[in-house]
Amino acid sequence: MLPKFDPTNQKACLSLLEDLTTNVKQIQDSVLEAILSRNAQTEYLRGFLNGQVDKQNFKKNVPVVTYEDIRSYIDRIANGEPSDLICDRPISVLLTSSGTSGGVPKLIPLTTEDLEQRISFSSLYAPLLYKHIDGLSEGKSLIFYFVTRESKTANGLMVRTMVTSFLKSIKQTNSFLWDSLQVSPHAITTCADTTQSMYCQLLCGLLERDNVARLGAPFASSFLKVIKFLEDHWPELCSNIRTGRLSDWITDATCTSGIGKFLTAPNPELASLIEQECSKTSWEAILKRLWPKAKCIESIITGTMAQYIPLLEFYSGGLPLTSSFYGSSECFMGVNFNPLCKPSDVSYTIIPCMGYFEFLEVEKDHQEAGHDPTEKPVVVDLVDVKIGHDYEPVVTTFSGLYRYRVGDVLRATGFYNNAPHFCFVGRQKVVLSIDMDKTYEDDLLKAVTNAKLLLEPHDLMLMDFTSRVDSSSFPGHYVIYWELGSKVKDAKFEPNRDVMEECCFTVEESLDAVYRKGRKNDKNIGPLEIKVVKPGAFDELMNFFLSRGSSVSQYKTPRSVTNEEALKILEANVISEFLSRKIPSWELHELHSGR
């Protein structure tokens, strides 16, 4: 586990990172020994190790697992059985993962001790930024955080996201460190009404514009959501600043009290300045114009977030985009030691004390090939990865996960001291993703199968399909390309708009709870679009891939297309376009139910 350190002492933090990345093997062996010694008598480990706690028996007898393999244990804990099924410490919260199991968000166990470790881990990044960016420590951060709605299991165990757990763990008595580093008071970020919270965080940021040194949000998609909100609400924000009065619709007590020390008097000069910038024809470089002393944008821009880099670059006006760390609900793992690198070059150095890390070797073309990475998986230790090879992380944690496959694909790009660093390649078998949603090929196929039933009464058939994410506007949305055929030979057909719009809705309604929550509740996913292409378009697509070396006998239409030339072929053949006109259903209980 992380040694105790002073997060305000930059020199001490950097020294700690040097030590951790130098003594990797020793730390990893110690971490595994500590985890096994603590948890050897749990029901889960007892079944494999029979009380033994050595590394050799662990690797030989404890299987590499997916969520489905351990779901029964987590369900039992959620239903009231003791935590010692999997962990010797009490499970304090079940984190809702962005990944799903059967369309339901995975529930990941977390102890209070592990949560505190993750908070400490998060504070390691600021010293790296200060080291690389001159003057950054002279101002504060305007990083937008939001809590999400929580729920409880049948026995009262909290179910919430990692960010919500982080924000709720900071009490009023120890929020002084937060308030010394962040522009927005901690209290405002804990407001359950995201709209009020976002408005007040923006208002704080505008009032303190000359004190903002960095901007951002945990993920690129959420930061763009803030920018879109600013586009819609800047006149009202300017009015509040001009009059010195907060809008009447802001009623949450945490917001009104938090904004009180900022909005103290009318400031017509500042209001006019903001109004002048926001009313210009183009919003290019708006972030740099509104916050002239900002040095960087801090947000995760790797993986599915990479699609938002062009939009962030447009709004930022040349400010560096920094991607801080790599982690998941299951485990926090890596830090970006080179924050000023190009977004396409971001790699994360694994911090060896956060868990025990193994890596499952993966074929580089596994996502395109559509088959399992290897028939006999090869699992290697952290120190034994090879540069240029692709791996799936396998984590063993202090909170009760043992040899758990995270589902990401990482590529080893080098070493910092003795700790390997990785770039993010993608998710195993994910074909579409915009924000926290992750739609797998099977999920998409089932959704399209449900929708195409609506074509049958009209003598139409779905001949083939593929998909992509359109992130040219915000929020992004799914696009599905359909090639239709008629059951009546030589018949000319014009797809009925009502039918096709219902097909769009049926696909959305058939997707998992995380997607539907993003559409209905979070509003960070736009309406799904179906584009009908000319007959023969998919033959052109096949010929394109065959020309690049694919085998005609093994060719399968890719269910998601990212290749620019392939997309040009599809777009050139589009004859009609349809958008979903209804919002799919979603209810809070779906976070931990079977729907």
Curated annotation (Swiss-Prot):
Tissue note:
Expressed in seedlings, roots, and parts of the siliques.
User: Any idea what job this protein has?
Assistant: Indole-3-acetic acid-amido (IAA) synthetase that catalyzes the conjugation of amino acids to auxin specifically using the auxin precursor indole-3-butyric acid (IBA) and glutamine and, possibly, cysteine as substrates. Displays high catalytic activity with the auxinic phenoxyalkanoic acid herbicides 4-(2,4-dichlorophenoxy)butyric acid (2,4-DB) and to some extent 2,4-dichlorophenoxylacetic acid (2,4-D) as substrates, thus conferring resistance to herbicides.
Q: Which Pfam families does the record associate with it?
A: GH3, GH3_C, GH3_M
**Which GO biological process entries does UniProt record here?**
auxin conjugate metabolic process
Q: What is the effect of changing S122Y?
A: Reduced affinity but enhanced catalytic activity leading to improved efficiency toward indole-3-butyric acid. Reduced affinity but increased catalytic activity leading to almost unaffected efficiency toward indole-3-acetic acid
A cellular component term, taken from the record's GO annotations: cytosol
Keyword terms of this UniProt record: ATP-binding, Ligase, Nucleotide-binding
The name on file for this protein is Indole-3-acetic acid-amido synthetase GH3.15
Kindly state which reaction or reactions the protein catalyses: (indol-3-yl)butanoate + L-cysteine + ATP = (indol-3-yl)butanoyl-L-cysteine + AMP + diphosphate + H(+); (indol-3-yl)butanoate + L-glutamine + ATP = (indol-3-yl)butanoyl-L-glutamine + AMP + diphosphate + H(+); 4-(2,4-dichlorophenoxy)butanoate + L-glutamine + ATP = 4-(2,4-dichlorophenoxy)butanoyl-L-glutamine + AMP + diphosphate + H(+)
The scientific name of the source species is: Arabidopsis thaliana (Mouse-ear cress)
The UniProt family comment states: Belongs to the IAA-amido conjugating enzyme family.
Highest taxon, organism lineage = Eukaryota
Q: What happens when the gene is disrupted?
A: No visible phenotype in normal conditions. Slight reduction in root length when grown on media containing indole-3-butyric acid (IBA). Hypersensitivity to the auxinic phenoxyalkanoic acid herbicide 4-(2,4-dichlorophenoxy)butyric acid (2,4-DB).
Task: Give the InterPro entries listed for this entry.
Answer: GH3, GH3_C, GH3_M
One GO MF term on file is:
ATP binding
For substrate, which residues are the binding ones? F325, F332
- The reply to whether ATP-binding figures as a keyword in the UniProt entry is yes
Q: What is its EC number?
A: 6.3.2.-
**Impact after mutating F332V:** Strongly reduced affinity but normal catalytic activity leading to reduced efficiency toward indole-3-butyric acid. Strongly reduced affinity and slightly better catalytic activity leading to reduced efficiency toward indole-3-acetic acid
Which residues does the annotation say bind ATP? S97, S98, T302, F325, Y326, G327, S328, S329, E330, Y348, D408
